[in-house]
Amino acid sequence: MSNTDKERAIAAALAQIEKSYGKGSVMKLGQRPHVDIEAVSTGSLGLDIALGIGGVPKGRIIEIFGPESSGKTTLTLHLIAEAQKKGGTCAFIDAEHALDPAYAKKLGVNIDELIISQPDTGEQALEIADTLIRSSGIDMIIIDSVAALVPKSEIEGEMGDAQMASQARLMSQALRKLTASINRTNCIAVFINQIRMKIGVMFGSPETTTGGNALKFYASVRIDIRRIGSIKDKEEVIGSQTKVKVVKNKVSPPFKTADFDIMYGSGISKEGEIIDLGVKLDIVEKSGSWFSYKNVRIGQGRENVKQYLKEHPQISNEIEKIIREKSSKITNINLDQTEEEND
């Protein structure tokens, strides 16, 4: 077959497919209208840089997992706040029935515009999510959490009844159904997940996430979030030192990590990140306990500098802008290349 005949055959096949399934159902990759991946900020400057595209990608599935009280819900509430700032509509599927509206409001979430559902079963939760995503009106949907998506058969059964992998089957079926709708509507679907321990593991990490393996494969980005220490004011604990690791990333190189502070009552401390990244990039000078910007001392001690940046937002925004401009030069934000994941 000559090249001309091949081109005609392909053109005829494409025309037939478009006639059957609609315009845009098949095309050459270069003809796609949106080639660049859009992103929504996570609310953490360091994590935005670690993700490589300035935030979480639109039209993809995201998994955020970690131990209890590690900051999973706090991070997702910051995601909602950032999406709403861009004019996006967000939905929260609260399967754990534990969302605190007052805390969400403190983190910048417009609770009057946030759609919330507290379903009774896993099937109901995922059907609601599917309907909202298919509407094309939702920009971000949060499912909190995968562990709380209890199958109807388990709820209606007796305590102690064996339910072999029913949750894993439910998740596998739901993700097969959801993934095309998520991509087509450019919606961000964020699944919060918990950690469990595998029994009898002799080598490697015994930790695993709930809901089977389907979410690991369908997720474009997987974020591991951990509490690594406390922030104290004298004897009182006022926050948590937090480390996040991007263990899977289909839109940028994975395995990058970032550290930030989560302050109780106010969420991720942007000022703390600006100081740390500013020092790392030589934008902010540190001499002993003193910090300087443009040869002007801005405070002694990290907490005092954080307060200074809160009181002088124009300087904070200026440093943040320079950090984002220089972020392409950061090849290692506490990057750990010794660990690998073959998802």
Curated annotation (Swiss-Prot):
Query: What is its subcellular localisation?
Result: Cytoplasm
InterPro entries reported in the protein's UniProt record: AAA+_ATPase, DNA_recomb/repair_RecA, DNA_recomb/repair_RecA_CS, P-loop_NTPase, RecA-like_C, RecA-like_N, RecA_ATP-bd, RecA_C_sf
Q: Which UniProt keywords apply?
A: ATP-binding, Cytoplasm, DNA damage, DNA recombination, DNA repair, DNA-binding, Nucleotide-binding, SOS response
Q: Which cellular component terms (GO) are annotated to the entry?
A: cytosol
Q: Which GO terms describe its molecular function?
A: ATP binding; ATP hydrolysis activity; ATP-dependent DNA damage sensor activity; damaged DNA binding; single-stranded DNA binding
Q: Which GO terms describe its biological process?
A: DNA recombination; DNA repair; SOS response
The residues forming a coiled coil are none
Per UniProt, where does ATP bind? Answer: G66, P67, E68, S69, S70, G71, K72, T73
Q: What Gene3D superfamilies does this protein map onto?
A: P-loop containing nucleotide triphosphate hydrolases
PROSITE patterns xrefs: RECA_1 (PS00321), RECA_2 (PS50162), RECA_3 (PS50163)
Q: Does the keyword Nucleotide-binding apply?
A: yes
**Disulphide bridges, residue numbers:** none
Chief location category = cytoplasm
Q: Which domain of life is it from?
A: Bacteria
Report the protein's function: Can catalyze the hydrolysis of ATP in the presence of single-stranded DNA, the ATP-dependent uptake of single-stranded DNA by duplex DNA, and the ATP-dependent hybridization of homologous single-stranded DNAs. It interacts with LexA causing its activation and leading to its autocatalytic cleavage.
Q: What family does the Swiss-Prot or TrEMBL record give for this protein?
A: Belongs to the RecA family.
Q: What is this protein called?
A: Protein RecA
In its UniProt entry, the species of origin is given as Rickettsia africae (strain ESF-5)
